[in-house]
């Protein structure tokens, strides 16, 4: 129970710390608002580099911000920077968080003392700092619960042998292949720095006597995965998705011409294509296949292309092809929840980032899954075989894919045939359950309320 120095009741005050990337910040701010709704106060902390990319933070009673330097306040300039970034983030961030917590606990004013720390994926060092001040910690997991289970079993020597035989059978999880694993665990795509950080996450959870994890999912979607690892108390509190008005998306632009364009299209006729904030890193052969596949359908499309370097992108012949089509519209940004909620959208071509997948689920839009890295490979497996709301693009061992495969997937979802109707019906079913879970009094809402009440 949170109490003041004189013994009176104090509401919980959470320090919420996230990795400085959009995919981490947006769900964290959704969580902050919901924690405040249930009577808590929140200090949100991430790197200055993210603050500079964001719009003006929301002015919300009970929400304050504490920015810290990660050593790269102007952002990463090259791949070489990425090799040392994680260690610098840990070093700079740890020192900054110590100062933030110490200043808060030493305050003699009416400032509410921090009573707990919540930290997201890729910053496991936050839990170490929190323990120095004897503050309880909670992990905010912003990927599928299934992915956390996989990492737990992979880094636990008692289960490591299960990954030596295919198909891989893990407790309470669907059968998977090596290609369905998060890319960091695939031999051909392993990233040593990511593996170190993920291992540290599991080790941090192992040090807790009763580790608690707030998971951006909902019980109906991942019931078995949420109870797969008996030691971990996973609390489903999702989907943490912004409203279709996009008022809490601090990274959106003011370009809304796409709305009028969508209004002019027939119901369920538009292919919406967005491959996330790292779409600029899409391999050229994937961009080529995607371009030819989309154009071959002769269907209207809305394509999100984020140009970091406009002059360089002008040289991209595939970008010129899609811009030259009279059937499509290319924009730099959009309110994704608003687009997915539009009746003209019939299909979502996505990289299967977890935020995008949840937004698709909550909107009831079937998908063509084109995963690239990290948890996206596992999510695509769930999309196609478990939730059955879309189809996954088949990619060769060397990452090869052609335009015909893209066209095949799009037609399978958009054709109106028996399989397409089944996907759409499943999407509508999951939409209803997703909306119900996050609604006031819904399962996820009650779970979060219970989490806050335990700390009061």
Curated annotation (Swiss-Prot):
It catalyses: a 5-hydroxy anthocyanidin + UDP-alpha-D-glucose = an anthocyanin 5-O-beta-D-glucoside + UDP + H(+). Pfam families: UDPGT. Keywords: Glycosyltransferase, Phenylpropanoid metabolism, Transferase. Induction: By PAP1. It comes from the Eukaryota. The keyword Transferase applies. Pathway: Pigment biosynthesis; anthocyanin biosynthesis. The active site is at 24 (proton acceptor). The keyword DNA damage does not apply. Signal peptide: none annotated. InterPro entries: UDP_glucos_trans, UDP_glycos_trans_CS. UDP-alpha-D-glucose binds at residues 336, 351, 354-356, 359, 375-376. Its EC number is 2.4.1.-. An anthocyanidin binds at residues 24, 374. GO terms for biological process: anthocyanin-containing compound biosynthetic process; phenylpropanoid metabolic process. One of its GO terms (molecular function) is anthocyanin 5-O-glucosyltransferase activity. Belongs to the UDP-glycosyltransferase family. Catalyzes the glycosylation of anthocyanins from UDP-glucose. This is UDP-glycosyltransferase 75C1. It comes from Arabidopsis thaliana.
